[in-house]
Amino acid sequence: MISYEPVRGMKDYYGEELHKIKVVENAFLKIVKLAGYQEVETPIVEDFQLFALKGGEELRNTMYVFKDKAGREVALRPEFTPSIVRFYLNSLQHLPKPIRLYYLGTVYRYDEPQFGRYREFRQAGIELLGSSNIYSDLEILQILIEIYRELNLINKIRLKINNISLIRKILNKLNISDNLQEHFLHLIDKGKIDEALSLLPSSEYTELITNILSVNNLDISSYNKIKEDLTEKYNLKDLIQDLDRIMLLKNILDNLGVNSYIDLGFVRGLAYYTGLIFEVLHPSVSFSIAGGGRYDNLVELYGGPQTPAIGFAIGVERTALVLEEPNTVKEKQNKIGVIVLSDEAILYAIRIVDKLRSNNYIATINLKSISISKLIPSYAEEGYSFLIFIGKKEYEDKTITLKNLSTKEQVTIKEENLLDYLKQII
């Protein structure tokens, strides 16, 4: 017998839960369109090597990977950025820079399912390709902030930021290979600090990395101390610009009234980040609800010209989880049920329904075969605001009988007055 449950790690959505998801998506779409971003859609199925090239074979265990009927190894996309870069290289290189793109769709990861983590989930994100200056960092952060302001969450969230370039440049000084660097950062991301540090040779730079990773809330005192050490103790003046850049971003976020902090031990799980990285946190959940960063080398890694880029992805379902109570996010819906009491009135009733829908009212014709005494409470329970009764008399007189399910008031009015009457009472 077929199971009625969705496949493990997948989830059905309906009602209020789905409504909140749509609220998040609509807020995202509103802001990114106003910011001048263009929509792009890419396939769910991609060549596995698109993701493995930078992430390595260890990605295989967390992805849906399979061979198609032609024997090609393909995967369900675990994220969007590699697909966007592939599309850019295939179709958009000729356009003037920077290029602003947005996407919205499902991604797939073979993780262990738990609260807030499913194997299929939605991501809404943007990518800005062709700019490396700090203004592009600010543009991305500003758009992210505006989306959460639109969702009335700006005073609840906290933005965690870092510049991964600091750690990468020190690892380069230690002559750590790219593959070992990714493994090191992967361990840091999983909280396995000691195991990660054990991979490094004994060196003063290893000591520096240890010290930097321990700074989880950079203040002016620790900022000045690290700058002094980079200059006088380690002779790494070229790293100061990376430290200054993240500190400048933090100061700007402060001036914008955004709750943010710099965690120098923060790294993100994706292997391609090269500069600014960030995550959005909310106190009601233990996981991030959005994140992103700069990936200046990914286009070149895929065989294209050196092209700086930055972007973010919002976890749509995760953000929906932390929305306020339904009445603060739910659009006012005035659902109207139309009850046809006479067969000869059906065409008249259809015309009424069409008029209501054309004026943005939710209207349905009754299909329930139950008595009027049971019909009225059933519609009230389903969230309807009004019922319209249309019988032989209403059809002949071109009137409708309207019942307000909140006040219990019932009136009979002319058809041509219906819309004006509804505007007065809603």
UniProtKB/Swiss-Prot annotation:
It comes from Sulfurisphaera tokodaii (strain DSM 16993 / JCM 10545 / NBRC 100140 / 7). It comes from the Archaea. Pfam families: HGTP_anticodon (PF03129), tRNA-synt_His (PF13393). This is Histidine--tRNA ligase. SUPFAM superfamilies: Class II aaRS ABD-related, Class II aaRS and biotin synthetases. HAMAP family: His_tRNA_synth (MF_00127), HisZ (MF_00125). Its EC number is 6.1.1.21. GO terms for molecular function: ATP binding; histidine-tRNA ligase activity. NCBIfam families: hisS (TIGR00442). InterPro entries: aa-tRNA-synth_II (IPR006195), aa-tRNA-synth_II/BPL/LPL (IPR045864), Anticodon-bd (IPR004154), Anticodon-bd_dom_sf (IPR036621), His-tRNA-ligase (IPR015807), HisRS-like_core (IPR041715), HisRS/HisZ (IPR004516), HisZ (IPR004517). Keywords: Aminoacyl-tRNA synthetase, ATP-binding, Cytoplasm, Ligase, Nucleotide-binding, Protein biosynthesis. GO terms for cellular component: cytoplasm. It catalyses: tRNA(His) + L-histidine + ATP = L-histidyl-tRNA(His) + AMP + diphosphate + H(+). It is found in: Cytoplasm. Belongs to the class-II aminoacyl-tRNA synthetase family. The keyword Aminoacyl-tRNA synthetase applies. GO terms for biological process: histidyl-tRNA aminoacylation; L-histidine biosynthetic process.
